[in-house]
Each structure stands twice: as structure tokens, then as C-alpha cells.
Amino acid sequence: MFAHGYGCDQNMWRAVVPSFEDEYRVVLFDYVGSGLSDLSSFNRTRYSSLTGYAADVIEIIEELGLDRVTFIGHSVSSMIGALAAIERPKLFEQIVMIGPSPSYINDGDYVGGFGRSDIEDLLEMLDNNHAGWSAMMAPIIMGNPDRPELAAELEASFCKTDPVHAQHFARVTFLSDNRSDLVKLHTRTLILQCAEDAIAPLSVGQYVHRCLPESQLIVMDATGHCPHLSSPGPVTDAIRAFI
């Protein structure tokens, strides 16, 4: 099961998925408010925290009659998958986290990468200028400035997301703090961390690894927050070796 990150959709996995289709049953989906999802299904109360999105993951697994799922989550989906596995551990065989962050906000000795005021400023800009926010953030998130087409694709993905849902999901994503949940996760986990990532720095990947005794950390020689787009080969190889 492949789960996309904020502002994206299932199409973002297109360079990775073909390597698994012959051997595994592959499940792709869009979270409510993303991609081609049914926007009428959005419930502000249900999706006021990441647990609502985790409940959707569990519902999909149950509806399809799956078990022993390998959950591969990018960015915020890493924590969504963790919450789902904590709630229903028997459904999950293993988890792959790509660029995970349990909290984006610095707190004492914990370095999440952003000050609270930084996050508040980003959210305010998103509220006031969705297109401008997308144009500013896409190159930062994607990295790889020598390949501007990658940032352009991410910007287009941000821009086609419904602004109301984008603003809501951004708040839930960037203001969540799931550090205390990590110790509850006992599912075998692979953490794929880019050596340079402006959104989830190396220190965060190392923190997640320390908190998860059943985890393996691979620091890839890659930049940016979306290696499944910028470096799909190494991502695919790491996942295959793990599962």
C-alpha cells in the first residue's frame, strides 16, 4: 500500500510502483481532499487530526480484505501509517517511512527543522495566497535545483489541490506532534532519509530511528523531500531489499 504526502496524490508513485506490480498486490489511493478523491466525503471533525486519515487507511485495508500489509508512506503518511499500525497492528507486516517527521517544530533539544513562528507564517501565507505558497515551497521541498521540472510538477500538484482542503491538511500536518506515539509502534520499519532534506532534516530521521527499536535507517545519497520522484531507483532498491 503506497500512501502519498501532503499536496500530492497517488500518481507521485508512478516511478516506483511498476517494480512491485508483478509480485505484489499494489494498492494506491488518494486521501480525502487530495487527487481525485470525493470532496463531499470531507468531515472537518474526523480529519481534525492524523488519526482520521489513519482510520481511512484501516478502512481501505478492511474493505479490500487485506492483511500482512506493507505500508509505504511518504512524509506525513509515515505518521499516518504509524498511527494505523498502532491501532490495528495485526493488519501490518512492515512499514516504510520516506522522509518521516513526528513533529516539524523545534522543541528544546528536539530539532524538527522549523520554529513555531516559521510554521505559522507558512500557514498564513497558504491561507492568503495558495498559488504563491505553492510556487515558493515546491522548489524548497523538492530540492534538486538542477532539475526544475521536478519542482514544477510538485507546484502543479499543490495548485490543483482544493485550497480549502489544502489549508486544513496543512494545519493538521505541520502542527501535529506524534513523538509520544512512536514508542507505541512495534511494527518492523524502514526509514528512508535523504542526506539533505529541508523539510525533514537528517536529525529527525535519526530521532525516529532511536524511538523505534524495530527500525532500520538508510540515509540515501539524495537531496530533497521527495526521493520517490527525484531518485526512484535507490528508493525502489531499498524497499525491495527490506521486504
Q: Could you say what each language-model-derived stretch is?
A:
Residues 1-5, 193:
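The conserved beta1-alpha1 loop
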Residues 5-8, 75:
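Active-site glycine-rich loops that stabilize anionic/oxyanionic intermediates
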Residues 18, 28-76, 237:
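Active-site loop/oxyanion-hole signature of alpha/beta-hydrolase fold enzymes
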Residues 82-87, 91-128:
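Flexible "cap/lid" loop of the alpha/beta hydrolase fold
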Residues 106, 110-114, 124-184:
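Conserved alpha/beta-hydrolase catalytic His-Asp/Glu region
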Residues 185, 191-193, 197:
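Short beta-strand/loop motif that positions the catalytic acidic residue
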Residues 198-204:
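Conserved alpha/beta-hydrolase "acid-adjacent" motif
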Residues 214-243:
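Catalytic active-site module of serine/aspartate enzymes centered on a nucleophile-bearing elbow/loop
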